């Protein structure tokens, strides 16, 4: 009897094993490679080819496949100050955002996670990732979904517990379509092809323009975006009161159902998150520097108002040479 029971048990185990194995999803294979930022062929790194800028920073490329999409992500950590924010740059064509993130991680510490559009290493950058097995290109900031869990796990691998502050950085096209707004005036200076402006109000966005509109908020495309649950007040959004007290341009994002963005993902999980945006001003030095400077100014405000991480105020890079003071005649 005992022998027969043992045989039946073994047969049952053989039948169940394949089914059980099918329920276990293997961990995604990730290729992690240390990289030298001074020899990288991508435009983001080429523009920052200064050895002093990268001292104390550790740079790795992380490659993996999640569902139908192949991803290439760069992780930049401040080795001296690893406990700062998680700086997220999802769109490869938003060049000022990448530069601001590198300067911010040098000053405030933490980790930069920047998505490289995997097919454009030898060509113009794109905000979308077209390296897919099938279907349409994927927006890196619309991929925080239940059916792509490995993507979120990889992007937020350094989040920690308690979670560190997440600061997402973006640049976007100028202006907006006034026809899409319920409150904005139809003026030539505000019309454009963008989707982000503190003059835009809709079911999704509730604007709070800066009262003084001093730089960098003289540009209505330079804003902080704070998400809040659709059945609650905008004041419940992370750090919303403090940012309003700082007289920032703020767009309150009303979230009823997730759109796959990191702002929505963070809201539903109670993570500290702020999104900073400014107008894309191209890749020429003057325009790139202007957009970068506006992002850095807003970063300073967020770090002063919303973060417990100690750090020096951001300084413009490269530093301007100091001129000797004029001596008074004796």
Please provide the spans of the model-predicted regions.
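Bacterial N-terminal signal peptides that target proteins for export
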Residues: 1-8
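Cleavable N-terminal signal peptides
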Residues: 9-10, 20
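Structured catalytic-domain cores with a bias toward divalent-metal coordination
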Residues: 23-327
């Amino acid at each position: 009897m005992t022998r027969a029971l043992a045989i039946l048990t073994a047969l049952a185990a053989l039948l169940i094993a394949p089914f059980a194995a099918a329920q276990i999803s293997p961990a995604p294979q990730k290729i992690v490679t240390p990289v030298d930022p001074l020899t990288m062929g991508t435009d983001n790194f080429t523009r920052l080819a200064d050895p002093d800028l990268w001292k104390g920073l550790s740079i790795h490329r992380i490659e993996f496949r999640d569902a139908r999409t192949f991803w290439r992500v760069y992780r930049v950590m401040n080795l001296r100050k690893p406990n700062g924010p998680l700086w997220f740059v999802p769109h490869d064509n938003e060049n000022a955002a990448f530069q601001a993130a590198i300067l911010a991680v040098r000053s405030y510490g933490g980790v930069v996670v920047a998505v490289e559009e995997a097919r454009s290493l030898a060509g113009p950058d794109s905000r979308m990732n077209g390296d897919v097995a099938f279907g349409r290109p994927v927006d890196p900031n619309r991929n925080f979904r239940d059916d792509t869990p490995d993507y979120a796990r990889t992007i937020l691998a350094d989040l920690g517990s308690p979670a560190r502050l997440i600061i997402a950085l973006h640049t976007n096209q100028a202006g907006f379509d006034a026809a899409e707004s319920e409150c904005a005036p139809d003026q030539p200076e505000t019309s454009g092809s963008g989707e982000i402006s503190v003059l835009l109000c809709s079911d999704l966005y509730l604007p709070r323009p800066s009262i003084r509109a001093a730089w960098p908020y003289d540009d209505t495309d330079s804003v902080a975006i704070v998400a809040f649950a659709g059945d609650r007040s905008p004041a419940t959004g992370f750090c919303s009161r403090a940012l309003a007290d700082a007289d920032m341009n703020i767009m309150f994002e009303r979230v009823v159902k997730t759109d796959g963005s990191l702002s929505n993902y963070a809201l539903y999980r109670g993570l500290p998150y702020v999104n900073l945006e400014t107008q894309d001003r191209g890749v020429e030095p003057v325009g790139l520097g202007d957009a970068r400077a506006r992002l850095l100014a807003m970063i300073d405000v967020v770090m002063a108002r919303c973060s417990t991480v100690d750090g020096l105020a951001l300084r413009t890079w490269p530093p301007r040479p100091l001129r000797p003071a004029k001596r008074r005649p004796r």
